[in-house]
Amino acid sequence: MSIIYLVINSFIFILPAYVANATPCIFGGGAPIDGGKCFFDGRRIIGNGVSWKGTFFGLFCGTITAILEGIIFNLNIFGTVAFNFNVFEWGIVGLLLSAGALFGDAIGSFIKRRLGLAQGRPAPILDQLGFIVFALLFVYPFAPVSYEMGIFLLVITPMIHLSANIIAYKLGIKDVWW
């Protein structure tokens, strides 16, 4: 697989997870998933940063992104890609990637609370890779990716995540640059 082919197909495949992970920053807020409850250690289970509204919109936007990819690539508007999914299958892939990304983000928040880190505080590696690892794990039974693609995504995602956060901060979408 050529490097260009790997890069293009990796971004096409993972885009729904990236969208799902970013959407709660824009459309989130409201009631937290943990209901404001505390864990055995007296700290919040997850915190206010993971809400039902953000989760819903993350799932919705990530899945819609994949369905749109399915429509575009099944019409061969931009040529062929490495994935031979019909539109329905793209929707399933998008839902799985989105659910995995959001679950990974929630797990990251859970771990950060156990470590005593307040909401919004940085946790390098955990913040950048938790969502992508779980997105790939959730989708793997339905659409396994190659080792090359998995490694590429694990290497490139922290840089993309940091860049996106800096842009969101400069646009006033996020309160912190990390």
Curated annotation (Swiss-Prot):
E.C. code: 2.7.7.67
Keywords: Cell membrane, Lipid biosynthesis, Lipid metabolism, Magnesium, Membrane, Phospholipid biosynthesis, Phospholipid metabolism, Transferase, Transmembrane, Transmembrane helix
An example molecular function term from Gene Ontology annotations: CDP-2,3-bis-(O-geranylgeranyl)-sn-glycerol synthase activity
Entries under Pfam families matching the protein: CarS-like
Domain of life: Archaea
Transmembrane segments: 3-23, 55-75, 91-111, 125-145, 149-169
Subcellular location field: Cell membrane
Cofactor(s) it depends on: Mg(2+)
Annotated metabolic or biological route of this protein: Membrane lipid metabolism; glycerophospholipid metabolism
Keyword Transmembrane helix annotated: yes
Cellular component annotations (GO), alphabetically ordered: plasma membrane
Catalysed transformations (reactions): 2,3-bis-O-(geranylgeranyl)-sn-glycerol 1-phosphate + CTP + H(+) = CDP-2,3-bis-O-(geranylgeranyl)-sn-glycerol + diphosphate
Membrane topology: Multi-pass membrane protein
Location, primary (coarse class): membrane
GO biological process, one term: glycerophospholipid biosynthetic process
Function per UniProt: Catalyzes the formation of CDP-2,3-bis-(O-geranylgeranyl)-sn-glycerol (CDP-archaeol) from 2,3-bis-(O-geranylgeranyl)-sn-glycerol 1-phosphate (DGGGP) and CTP. This reaction is the third ether-bond-formation step in the biosynthesis of archaeal membrane lipids.
Family assignment from sequence similarity: Belongs to the CDP-archaeol synthase family.
PANTHER family, per the entry: CDP-ARCHAEOL SYNTHASE
Protein name from the UniProt record: CDP-archaeol synthase
